[in-house]
Amino acid sequence: MSYDLIEWKIESLQIDYQEAICFMQQRIEDIYNGVQKELVWLLEHPPLYTAGTGAKVEDLLVDNLFPVYATNRGGKYTYHGPGQRIAYVMLNLKTRNKCNIRLYVETLGNWIVETLSHFSVKSYFNPDLIGVWVTHGGTEKKIAAFGIRIRKWVTYHGVSINIDTNLSHYSGIVPCGIKDYGITSLRKLGINISYEEFDIVLQEKFNEIFSNFN
């Protein structure tokens, strides 16, 4: 797969969640119809919660803390907000001959693990508790959450990675429906980097990891 066929769109301002959904839905139609390139879209949302298709009412602990959006991605409740890098990935699995959802999710996981490794963070992808995890202070904590949707074999939604996120904002939900584990960020792990620094490595590792994903 030639990587000049993939567009990278990096936002400098926060993007409204509903606007992002509308954009992705139109873009995946265009990708399916062959009139637009595949896209990796890097952005940040204002503070909000999203409820995936597996969300349970009881996992919303505080219903007036931030706006709550029902969404068609897989997964349960999660938080998005400042200090969190969102990577929405829109790839055509069919043209890549990779109509294998599990393989796609694992490849996303490897991408994030390799990116974090560049910053000397040892992490791992857990296929059962979907996400990328680290061991910090003797306990396992999630640093990156996954939620995807596939339509006509074109992917959308993606990954959120905590860079310098206010972790107290997770207090209004049971993140991803998992009660027994915590949430962390690069800042909490002692890694202080900018979005710009992170994005450069994210793109480099994407090209490496996805080079065989075709």
From Swiss-Prot:
GO cellular component, one term: cytoplasm
Reactions listed under catalytic activity: octanoyl-[ACP] + L-lysyl-[protein] = N(6)-octanoyl-L-lysyl-[protein] + holo-[ACP] + H(+)
Binding annotation for substrate: 73-80, 145-147, 158-160
Record GO biological process: protein modification process
Site (Lowers pKa of active site Cys): 142
Active site as annotated: 176 (acyl-thioester intermediate)
Gene3D superfamilies: Bira Bifunctional Protein, Domain 2
Pathway annotation from the record: Protein modification; protein lipoylation via endogenous pathway; protein N(6)-(lipoyl)lysine from octanoyl-[acyl-carrier-protein]: step 1/2
GO MF term list: lipoyl(octanoyl) transferase activity
Hydrolase as UniProt keyword: no
Disulfide-bonded cysteines: none
Compartments reported by the entry: Cytoplasm
Stated role: Catalyzes the transfer of endogenously produced octanoic acid from octanoyl-acyl-carrier-protein onto the lipoyl domains of lipoate-dependent enzymes. Lipoyl-ACP can also act as a substrate although octanoyl-ACP is likely to be the physiological substrate.
Name the UniProt record assigns to this protein: Octanoyltransferase
Organism: Ehrlichia chaffeensis (strain ATCC CRL-10679 / Arkansas)
Gene: lipB
